[in-house]
Amino acid sequence: MKCNIQVVICECCVSKPALLDIPALRKIASEAGNVTSVVVADAVCDGENLSDIIKEAKEKEVDRAIVLACHKRDVDPSLFKAYARAGVPANLVEVVNLREEVVLPGAAEPERAQAKAEAKLNAAIARVRMLEPLEKDTEEMRTRNIVIIGAGVAGRAAAEVAARSGAHTIMIEKTGKSLKSPGILMSHTTVIGGKGYGGNFTLRIKAGEKVEDLDCAAVIVATGGGWATLKGPLAKACKDAIPLFKLHEKLESGIVPTGPVVIVDTPDPSGKNVKVQDFAWEESLETAARLKKANPDTDVWVVFQEMRAFGLSELAYKEAAELGVRFVRYDKPAPPKIDPKEPAKLTVKDSAQAEVISIKFGTLVFASIPANADNERIADALRIPMSPEGGVRRGSIQRWPVSTPRPGVFVCGSALFPKSRAVAEAEGTAAGELAAEFVKKGEIEFGGIIAKVEQEKCSVCLTCVRTCPYEAPFIGEAGKIEIKAQLCQGCGMCAGICPSKAIELLNYTDDQLGTEARTLLGGDF
């Protein structure tokens, strides 16, 4: 196939640490067939470098590109947009992850790393020659509604920003909170199901005994952290233990708890879905300082396995220490314990002093935040993945910090994992802006890298229907499997599991992958 290929080598990704022979890679690329342009850039994500790359691509009439850099998810999206303006669609821009697959693991063996990099370059060139432009279609959005699930700090920030951008917002809150909302607030309401895709979602919501459908274009998950029933050996031994936010509420009401007060950073050292993050650390420090100010004679202890004072929280740590708050650090193998026979005494081994300390307390406080129990149900309804900690998984911490892998679904605040108020508010603002920008387009784009069915081979075994997490395959009018392009996310699970080999993933067909593999392994099979 006649084509003009541009090869871009990102020195930022492939030469730090200095390992690969960049001139050798450039020579191989320039001598390969169909390669008309080779560019070595300091950083492909840099605006000035990107302009030079695209300028040369236009001059050489490039219609395909190979970028030797880092993981595709970490490459600045502006790279693909710039290539699209130059007439090179995103599916014809092949990103080779030399940093994670070659440079970092091969640091101790430079020669093998160089050989692997050269092999991957040749394989990418062979693969790109086989690629074809893929068509995309558009569909009009039925509504411009943005649904925010959760009316906490992050949810309210998202709603305010989205509303200022002209979007119609609907906040869904499971409690009976009476809040000022820029749009509609649906309290005592939960999301129990959902269908559709980014731009045209339909959520099944329940308010009391009433169940109804709600159409929306985008969804922001802002469920917050979970304050579930405290579990674990400490909570079982001390029935009167309270979570940190309850102590905070008491202080706000002017109630000073009975001392001494012990704040422990985990309710269950052996439990799951418990994450102690900057929120808990910051709140622990500030609350401990407030306790000492309210009653200087009260002994306050902070017992922790790990603590980090982010940013200005360092001042809170310094203030708490100067006020007389005592800090005790323990090691994970030796967590704090409470003897059921003495439920008002906590025993812990101070790792700094290498001695066991017994602390008699009047109030025991747990600082950690379990994942919200609603996350799993909401993630299942929206067909989005979850993190091991029980939060919603985002696309990329570097490029998509408040986006999920699914278009039109955003996430912020402690729905990801526990956050401080400031961070939750900032993420809510970002999610609101992105959601508003998404619905402002008024139409959705779909197609490109999606699954395709050869119906002559289809045996209608329904394996793909049961496997697809997005419900894209369905039985069409001809009695064979078809793929709903708007739902397909191009994950390739159906293509990989189809026993009849009736499904292929466009841009990753058997011929394309076979050519790449044969070139990479240096054989004809």
Stretches found by the model and what they are:
Residues M1-F525:
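Residues forming the flavin
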